[in-house]
Amino acid sequence: SAVYKVKLIGPDGQENEFDVPDDQYILDAAEEAGVDLPYSCRAGACSTCAGKIEKGQVDQSDGSFLEDHHFEKGYVLTCVAYPQSDLVIHTHKEEELF
């Protein structure tokens, strides 16, 4: 399987970069890397873990909460997102969804 570099940018501009294999959810990999991210259901059925993709592609077909218009703007549920390329994601974006 492939491994991609994922950079997360938090609300205060802090950056964390770590490797994520293409069969691991970004949230799980972030926790393993010691990065503290918001989450609730861990099943893609709420919006607590939402982020916004600045660069790159994910597979988040396991999620159910976001709709097409969210995907078109780059929003991502990190708890059900597999990386499909190197990524830059801004985290803590739940309040922007509504």
From Swiss-Prot:
Any one annotated GO CC term: chloroplast
NCBIfam families linked: fdx_plant
Cofactor(s) named in the record: [2Fe-2S] cluster
Pfam families found in the cross-reference section: Fer2 (PF00111)
Function, as annotated: Ferredoxins are iron-sulfur proteins that transfer electrons in a wide variety of metabolic reactions.
Residue numbers binding [2Fe-2S] cluster: C41, C46, C49, C79
Species, as recorded: Raphanus sativus
Subcellular locations according to the entry: Plastid, Chloroplast
Protein's name in the database: Ferredoxin, root R-B1
Record-stated family: Belongs to the 2Fe2S plant-type ferredoxin family.
Cofactor note: Binds 1 [2Fe-2S] cluster.
PANTHER family in UniProt: FERREDOXIN (PTHR43112), FERREDOXIN-3, CHLOROPLASTIC (PTHR43112:SF30)
InterPro entries linked: 2Fe-2S_ferredoxin-like_sf, 2Fe-2S_ferredoxin-type, 2Fe2S_fd_BS, Beta-grasp_dom_sf, Fd_pln
Record Gene3D superfamilies: 3.10.20.30
Broad class of the protein's primary localization: plastid
UniProt key word Mitochondrion: no
Other remarks on this protein: In radish there are 4 ferredoxins: 2 are root-specific (R-B1 and R-B2), one is present in both leaves and roots (L-A), and there is a minor form which is leaf specific (L-B).
2Fe-2S ferredoxin-type domain segment(s): 4-95
Transmembrane residue ranges: none
GO biological process: electron transport chain
GO molecular function, one term: 2 iron, 2 sulfur cluster binding
Alphabetical keyword list: 2Fe-2S, Chloroplast, Electron transport, Iron, Iron-sulfur, Metal-binding, Plastid, Transport
